[in-house]
Amino acid sequence: MACCHKVMLLLDTAGGAARHSRVRRAALRLLTYLSCRFGLARVHWAFKFFDSQGARSRPSRVSDFRELGSRSWEDFEEELEARLEDRAHLPGPAPRATHTHGALMETLLDYQWDRPEITSPTKPILRSSGRRLLDVESEAKEAEAALGGLVNAVFLLAPCPHSQRELLQFVSGCEAQAQRLPPTPKQVMEKLLPKRVREVMVARKITFYWVDTTEWSKLWESPDHLGYWTVCELLHHGGGTVLPSESFSWDFAQAGEMLLRSGIKLSSEPHLSPWISMLPTDATLNRLLYNSPEYEASFPRMEGMLFLPVEAGKEIQETWTVTLEPLAMHQRHFQKPVRIFLKGSVAQWSLPTSSTLGTDSWMLGSPEESTATQRLLFQQLVSRLTAEELHLVADVDPGEGRPPITGVISPLSASAMILTVCRTKEAEFQRHVLQTAVADSPRDTASLFSDVVDSILNQTHDSLADTASAASPVPEWAQQELGHTTPWSPAVVEKWFPFCNISGASSDLMESFGLLQAASANKEESSKTEGELIHCLAELYQRKSREESTIAHQEDSKKKRGVPRTPVRQKMNTMCRSLKMLNVARLNVKAQKLHPDGSPDVAGEKGIQKIPSGRTVDKLEDRGRTLRSSKPKDFKTEEELLSYIRENYQKTVATGEIMLYACARNMISTVKMFLKSKGTKELEVNCLNQVKSSLLKTSKSLRQNLGKKLDKEDKVRECQLQVFLRLEMCLQCPSINESTDDMEQVVEEVTDLLRMVCLTEDSAYLAEFLEEILRLYIDSIPKTLGNLYNSLGFVIPQKLAGVLPTDFFSDDSMTQENKSPLLSVPFLSSARRSVSGSPESDELQELRTRSAKKRRKNALIRHKSIAEVSQNLRQIEIPKVSKRATKKENSHPAPQQPSQPVKDTVQEVTKVRRNLFNQELLSPSKRSLKRGLPRSHSVSAVDGLEDKLDNFKKNKGYHKLLTKSVAETPVHKQISKRLLHRQIKGRSSDPGPDIGVVEESPEKGDEISLRRSPRIKQLSFSRTHSASFYSVSQPKSRSVQRVHSFQQDKSDQRENSPVQSIRSPKSLLFGAMSEMISPSEKGSARMKKRSRNTLDSEVPAAYQTPKKSHQKSLSFSKTTPRRISHTPQTPLYTPERLQKSPAKMTPTKQAAFKESLKDSSSPGHDSPLDSKITPQKRHTQAGEGTSLETKTPRTPKRQGTQPPGFLPNCTWPHSVNSSPESPSCPAPPTSSTAQPRRECLTPIRDPLRTPPRAAAFMGTPQNQTHQQPHVLRAARAEEPAQKLKDKAIKTPKRPGNSTVTSSPPVTPKKLFTSPLCDVSKKSPFRKSKIECPSPGELDQKEPQMSPSVAASLSCPVPSTPPELSQRATLDTVPPPPPSKVGKRCRKTSDPRRSIVECQPDASATPGVGTADSPAAPTDSRDDQKGLSLSPQSPPERRGYPGPGLRSDWHASSPLLITSDTEHVTLLSEAEHHGIGDLKSNVLSVEEGEGLRTADAEKSSLSHPGIPPSPPSCGPGSPLMPSRDVHCTTDGRQCQASAQLDNLPASAWHSTDSASPQTYEVELEMQASGLPKLRIKKIDPSSSLEAEPLSKEESSLGEESFLPALSMPRASRSLSKPEPTYVSPPCPRLSHSTPGKSRGQTYICQACTPTHGPSSTPSPFQTDGVPWTPSPKHSGKTTPDIIKDWPRRKRAVGCGAGSSSGRGEVGADLPGSLSLLESEGKDHGLELSIHRTPILEDFELEGVCQLPDQSPPRNSMPKAEEASSWGQFGLSSRKRVLLAKEEADRGAKRICDLREDSEVSKSKEGSPSWSAWQLPSTGDEEVFVSGSTPPPSCAVRSCLSASALQALTQSPLLFQGKTPSSQSKDPRDEDVDVLPSTVEDSPFSRAFSRRRPISRTYTRKKLMGTWLEDL
């Protein structure tokens, strides 16, 4: 028929599933509206899907128009479901408008728009219209008129562009970035509806409508709606319009409520007029779809005059012209222009609904022809009314002599108001009032009229109250139902619509029906069937709604994650791939063994499909039928109920006519219904009590009645009825399941009753009865049945096992293996699983062959620990191996394992899959190759439990843990001891001789009692407290355990033979890599010796307290800080050593030394976090020395051991980072890091990123600054502290985020003033020392501090030669007693100190100060001096770190604020605690990292036992390098920990071992471009100095002396950014040992830092050195070939080693931050970052490195700098830098303000950092490269200091970029990227202005100075 309307729905699927319900509802509402308007037969529709983002979609199945009907709608829904799935696809190049236009064109051309109907067009339609028949033509005309000519329509269901920006993107797509101007309407029209499309639409009478499906949240957040109105305007030209989606679903008010409920924060809460919800949806659609003149004629507009109140002093009354449009067709129209007089305002007015008071409503608007000013005023009035929720009271003069009418004006929208005119039916009322008013004098008219208004309003309220009270009472159930829905409005029918088809009757309503039926007293006569039907319906609806919500929730969660995140799965995510494969294979094998039939029940799929608490519909229907015999009755009193129940009970028992379970169910439900009808609170509890008191009998009471009952059948029947009653109780009162005790009692009682049945009858009868119970209740209460079977001791039947929740068996793992006493019963025996007695190896072999042969019919069975989310108790299963077998097979326990060659571990990992099955089959000789610990498995208790009770009895007493240390379960995961024991006790039987079940959290005391060195004790302690279940990846834990046990066994030997481990340069440099034992031994020995002297008391304090403090700090970033701390320490040591041996060292050595110094600073700088933390650590330790001293005398000692200056530098920041709590330095940094993270992820990120960078920067700057300060002291000492403070102040704001970076240079106080300053302010340094700064504070402080520290580290080396020489002298001279050292330190640092004093904050934290005032070199230097002093104490500090760190660390944050005095205090404290060391360290730090190192070395040499010696050891002792190497794997943290532990030993060792064997390492550039390490034996005396230096370098820089190791670390970090995060130590290792460890890094990055970072890192630091921190080091060494591979590319990829770390950090910073959250991770990142630059330097080699470094200074902070690095061949570094920069920027974006501070810091720090890094990266790296064979160093022979200086200062380094210009450029770059970031903070601007100079000066001058010093 010609009059048939064709409707096309064109749906955009780009929005995804989020819009599914919105689109569905809009389509359904639209079709319903059209079918109501034209008739079902007159509307034919089709639908088409397209993707406006360009994703390809399959063609729609429906190819032509169809009639409206359920079938076509079902097709639509099906297609919609399939299309609107969440799928990831990137937007294509073409804009959305193009795709939309293409889809529209296809729609117009592909469909038959004008095809006539099949029925004859001439046949008239018999439709009565009045009294005539309509022919086709007249019908068509009428139809056209009906909807304003609407014949055919296309409805586009897609999000409509709202803002101008969205419109631009819609039209231009990817080009929107380049195009700045908004598109003109013409452009939009040409893109969307070009002329050809419009012509086709006109020809086919098609109107185009756009149904906007934009999400609410986006709608409210849109800045403007210009795009929306532009589209509206365009569509109006063709007769169409935009239809808001709320027209089809909810009103605005509801939408607003939904938004608020969903937690979406709107910038401003939307003010929605109640009128919007009053208007029916059909009215809205009519208005939108009708454009015909006829429609508008139904609502004629008229003009009116709005008279505003007369203002005082004005005689003329202002008037506005308005238009009035009736809202309804039936209301009376005014006859002439209406006059409206405003009288006042009223609040809380609602539309009256009184029957006596009628209302007419008119829409008031401002006419288009009125002046713009008036329109604006009108809109302001409307918005004011809306905002204040006011209404205006007005008099309306209708004219024609009629009296004025009272009206109320309410806001409707932004430009319209509603005038509601009250018209009463009694006209007399108004007449009377008016007559009275006329009678009165004119003066009284106003007041009288106000009285009239009041009286009218009062009457309105009275009438409302009357109608409310008079209204017939609404039934309670109806009110309840209405209460569950939103308030019903006049559009109630419209509102019901969206719910009726989707939800049906609500569960609340059905529950009310049940109540109605149960509560009505006069329904006795109602049929039994009807009552049962209502009851069953109610139950069905309620259960169905529950099931739907459950399934929907499960589907949602399924969509969110593909696989369940079980604890085991999460744990395995941290493992290396081979281990992961091994564990999955092992667990799945066990699952296969448990379910050989391949039933996938174990996978937990059935748990999802079954609703634990609900019966299926079929079962309900069955029950409904059975119930009809017992009618639920209505009882008035409880007595009636009880008598009925007892009568029923006795009748059932006596006659047996009624089915027992039906009777039981009926009785329980009757009681429940009765209590419900009484409105009982706690219904289920009361119901249970009622049933227990009146119905339940115990088996004891039944037995006592046995004598009375002669009838055995009655007795059995009663027992069965009691069983059913209890089961029904569990079913109908689910609350009983929540109480374990109640459930146990019920199960116990049922068990007793069943046993009575079995005794009375026989087991076969019982089996039959159990089958019946199973059939009835398996779907509803499977867990109860499972418990029942367990209680009876029966094997759980297969069908029940399949239904049980997946976590059922992990609670009682023995259920399926239990021997059943009733195995003779057929149904039981058939279901029982056979228990295989064959050894596990046979089973594995059998499984292996079977799985290979078997076809894949069934889905892979996954082990519960992998497949199930709910896992109650995890255990460690340790296979019990007899001692004999162990001996035979050479499977030695952990203690001996360290002696194994590293290759063993490699082989084990490599052959992991094969060994899984072959382990038992290997010959003893082969097995000896992998005599690692028997792998401990964390599995569900279900696995591999066999009944070998005989053997167990023999072996039970002999079970011995093969693992000496088991990581402590994190507090938040710990199960109460009582519950744990109860669970284990509740297991049906002992696991058996094979399996030892170890509780997850063994007593801590056991660990302590183990005989081991203090350092190891700390390590194990921290390990015990580590947050990870497996300290790291399993491989690592094995190696660590091996080392650990080995160390335990050999701890004494180690003490005696520290040197013995250093046999050759190779072992020295790569010992940790090649031999787990020797490095660890070395470290252990060194550590032990030192720890005995200094660390013995300190280490325990630091590391023992760490348990708690570590945990606390770790809670933030425990691991990272520690690592960072250690790393800083190592660097500090290195500097000392370097300083000490610079003079003695050859240029190469010096370079190496420098590098190592750099490295030490670079660690902080390389890995921003590291540097941040390290500096902090140093500061903290120094500063902490004081605070710690106050806090823990022991710790202070340690701190003393560690350079106070260093401590302040590192420690303070560290403190800030970690928390005063963390005992170990590393921990504190972590804390601070964690704290910032806590403070705000973004800020943390910024701090972490920027801070890492900033830290790095700052660290560098600080180090540099220290150096600079030395240099500057001479050159710029004059620069007042105030100046520095100013600088600091400028930077501070930025420091807020990365306070460390820029702010640190600034005066700490000022910093505190700034965001960082604020933090600092919160806890002044002094205060900080005592109190831990707030997390934020710590964070900010940390950044500041660490930069200082880093700077001091770096700076010291470059520091003025005099200082260097001074330090050297100090180094050379045996360290004076602590007091002397302190004095010396003070002397050395006096200028700095004075500076520090001038800048209390800066001086307070030498490191911090430096960081604070990188710009103020003098201050920095002073700080650095302090730091230098501190460096010597680093070893001590290490020991001290834990406790001291905590205080210091916090203090360090305060330190920034603290005055010089504090610094002095720290120094003095350091002195007290090994001031000699501290002093030397501090001095070395002050003069330069080299000096510091030298000092430390000297100390170590002079006083092997003195803390100073530890510092020296750390930096310079050969042992230390070994350990460093060892640490490398772990990362700087390990290194630091090693140093801390080894410092005394190391120093001592360096003294001892240095003389016996000293090696000179030179980096040589080969033609291939790879660096070559040349190791020469050196004169023992010089060697002593040089070696300690190199060692310190290697340990400190891990790049200088152990360049190879250091590099590999870097490379590792590079190769595995994740590892970097995972285990900062690893990254560091990677960086340090790219050559050898590099490959490992990739493989082993599984340092398991994931855990390590959070909790392991601290252990790493602590035990990282002695233990093999990561599997990397421990067992798997990369083949030499791989190690020797050029790493340039990889480094670049990874972010250029340290760069990589940085890059990784930067690129992954967001993620990295989260990773960094774990202390270790943060540290790792920083380390990795620091290391990475070194790697790149390796690659740069030679001169290239220097230039590279130089630019990197800026480059690190800036992309430009990065690019300059790239120019030098540091492309990788550049990438890293860029990545990091990007990450930083991302962080900045996240937190602009913070970022700004951070950026400024980062930038300022960056320059200084880069300068610092430069020395560290450029010089140090060059040296490191030289030192490290793997790195490719361009320097063939050692560069002379002068040559290096020349290179450094060469313009080539800056290639057209002055350092200042470079820094500017980078800054500019930054600004471009984040203009707001840069410009937001004046500080950052100021800093940027200054920074270039300081940076330039720092970089060039510092480098020159540094070189000269060297």
UniProtKB/Swiss-Prot annotation:
GO biological-process terms attached to the record: DNA repair; DNA replication; mitotic DNA replication checkpoint signaling; mitotic G2 DNA damage checkpoint signaling; regulation of DNA-templated DNA replication initiation; response to ionizing radiation
Ranges in a coiled coil: none
Residues recorded as bearing Phosphoserine in the entry: 292, 441, 599, 820, 838, 865, 923, 938, 1001, 1026, 1057, 1078, 1125, 1141, 1413, 1484
Compositional bias ranges of the Basic and acidic residues kind: 545-558, 595-608, 616-632, 1001-1010, 1275-1289, 1489-1500
Keywords: Cell cycle, DNA damage, DNA repair, Nucleus, Phosphoprotein
Gene Ontology terms: cellular component: cytosol; intracellular membrane-bounded organelle; nucleoplasm; nucleus
Gly residues compositional bias, start-end: 1694-1704
Main subcellular location: nucleus
Region (Disordered): 545-568, 595-632, 833-859, 877-905, 981-1012, 1027-1453, 1488-1523, 1580-1637, 1687-1709, 1746-1766, 1796-1830, 1850-1877
InterPro entries: Treslin, Treslin_M, Treslin_N, Treslin_STD
Phosphothreonine, modified sites: 1134, 1307
Record's compositionally biased regions (Polar residues): 893-902, 1027-1046, 1805-1816, 1850-1863
Alphabetized GO MF terms: chromatin binding
Biased composition (Basic residues): 850-859
Subunit structure: Interacts with TOPBP1 (via BRCT domains); interaction takes place in a CDK2-dependent manner. Component of the replisome complex composed of at least DONSON, MCM2, MCM7, PCNA and TICRR.
PANTHER family: TRESLIN (PTHR21556:SF2)
Protein family: Belongs to the treslin family.
Protein name: Treslin
